[in-house]
Amino acid sequence: MLFSRIIAASAQRKLSVYLKKGGLVAYPTESCYGLGCLPTLAKALGKLAHLKKRPQHKGMIVIGNQLEQLQPLLQMPSENIQTMLRNEWPAPKTFLLLAKSGVLPALRGKRRSKLAVRVPDHTGARRLCQALGMPLVSTSCNRAGKRACRTEREVRRQFGRDVWIVGGRIGRQKSPSQIIDGETGKRLR
């Protein structure tokens, strides 16, 4: 299904219902396909970690179409940090910011207080979040130890019918997004 079609009302409703039931979605991002789910559903986060064979102590990245869509998951950053984020995004830059206390440990990582968030530099990924009206988890679409999927065909080969696939082209970014501590400015990846 192409991004232009996902915005059609019927497809949008179907995908939204699917995600609210704990479904997983694969979609193009800056450097590869992303694999995601709703960031507020423990069942979906567990399913995603299991499918990827990913250790559950690792945190996950959440993407949104703009900062305001991510704010319900975050403690309100200072005005300076908000200004910096608005100037930096959209970009292949993920920032670690203080998470609200109700954010699931499976999302932020066990014993961690910060959440990794990004407004991607991929129009389709932003439009997907905008069309759904909610942020999405965004991990690389691959099983642990395997290369990240770069095409719809590769997603089908690795995951079959376990995920809803949003077709489209990935961006031109060659490497994963940078990860930066939003408070200290320290680059972690």
From Swiss-Prot:
This is Threonylcarbamoyl-AMP synthase. GO terms for cellular component: cytoplasm. Its EC number is 2.7.7.87. It holds the Pfam family Sua5_yciO_yrdC. It comes from Neisseria gonorrhoeae (strain ATCC 700825 / FA 1090). Belongs to the SUA5 family. TsaC subfamily. It is an enzyme of class 2 (transferase). It catalyses: L-threonine + hydrogencarbonate + ATP = L-threonylcarbamoyladenylate + diphosphate + H2O. The lineage of its organism: Bacteria, Pseudomonadati, Pseudomonadota, Betaproteobacteria, Neisseriales. Keywords: ATP-binding, Cytoplasm, Nucleotide-binding, Nucleotidyltransferase, Transferase, tRNA processing. One of its GO terms (molecular function) is tRNA binding. It is found in: Cytoplasm. Residues 9-189 form the YrdC-like domain.
